[in-house]
């Protein structure tokens, strides 16, 4: 295999034998590539910087089998996301998604989109609701790039436009996991959404989070948890397995919500 230079983000790093590491790298050139990093588990190895959530420039080669990293340079690290379990869970969820959707062939824009959403997680780490919303939106953007977009524009049964009538609170649409969203309550639905929930979900395909005129995030935390559930169901159905990191994020947010309610009750 020819010597080459790769620039990409470390999605996953695990042990390989006694002294080496196995690196899963996302790059524009090759999509997801598995590489051996020789000696990276040794304390003073020059290749020990091959860590998850790190943007790397690698010199790679090898005559046959698993390609090996010859040299390594760290271009940027998202290690700060590990300071909180919530941001770490969201970042891990993004990486796991990229491992699934970028494995076959390179996906144009996937690396840049992943880095953008990792930066947003870091910027919004101080506000739990913003972090949760960014996690839902980031997952939707990555799914769309990978060809697994949520069909949010038309009813999967009738083909009629999905136009949520804001203010008509008895209206519902149903999530049919294999097919998409259908108007009205439908048998076999995994969950139903009201008009404001669907409208909020539809806006997540845009570049920025939905905000009110005063700049505040639209939607309360329980609604964002419901939209997270939509994403979890879609991933589990169409990628053949769930995303444990998203489940961990849900647990973290729910636990903080319960803790906050307890504190509010004690102070009242």
Curated annotation (Swiss-Prot):
It comes from the Bacteria. Belongs to the RecO family. Keywords: DNA damage, DNA recombination, DNA repair. GO terms for cellular component: bacterial nucleoid. One of its GO terms (biological process) is DNA recombination. Involved in DNA repair and RecF pathway recombination. This is DNA repair protein RecO. Coiled coil: none annotated. The keyword DNA repair applies. The keyword DNA repair applies. InterPro entries: ARFGAP/RecO, DNA_rep/recomb_RecO_N, NA-bd_OB-fold, RecO. SUPFAM superfamilies: ArfGap/RecO-like zinc finger (SSF57863), Nucleic acid-binding proteins (SSF50249).
């Amino acid at each position: 295999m020819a010597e080459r230079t790769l620039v990409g983000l470390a999605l996953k790093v695990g042990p390989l034998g006694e002294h080496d590491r196995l690196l899963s790298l996302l790059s524009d050139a090759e999509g997801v590539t598995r590489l051996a990093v020789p000696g990276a588990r040794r304390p003073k190895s020059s290749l020990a910087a091959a860590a998850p959530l790190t943007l790397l420039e690698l010199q790679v080669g090898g005559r046959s089998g698993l390609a090996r990293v010859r040299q390594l340079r760290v271009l940027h690290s998202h290690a700060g996301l590990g300071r909180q379990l919530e941001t770490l869970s969201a970042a891990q969820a993004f990486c796991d998604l990229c491992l699934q959707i970028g494995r076959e062939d390179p996906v144009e824009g996937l690396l840049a989109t992943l880095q953008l959403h990792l930066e947003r997680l870091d910027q919004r780490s101080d506000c739990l609701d913003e972090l949760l919303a960014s996690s839902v939106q980031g997952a939707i953007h990555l799914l769309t790039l990978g060809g697994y977009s949520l069909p949010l524009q038309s009813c999967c049964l009738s083909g009629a436009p999905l136009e949520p009538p804001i203010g008509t609170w008895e209206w519902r649409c149903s999530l049919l996991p294999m097919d998409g969203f259908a108007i009205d309550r439908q048998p076999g639905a995994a969950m139903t959404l009201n008009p404001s929930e669907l409208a909020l979900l539809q806006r997540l395909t845009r570049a920025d989070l939905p905000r009110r005129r005063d700049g505040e995030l639209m939607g309360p935390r329980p609604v964002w948890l419901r939209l997270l559930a939509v994403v979890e169901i879609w991933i589990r159905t169409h990628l053949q397995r769930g995303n444990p990191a998203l489940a961990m994020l849900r647990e973290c947010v729910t636990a903080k919500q319960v803790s906050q309610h307890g504190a509010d009750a004690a102070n009242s």
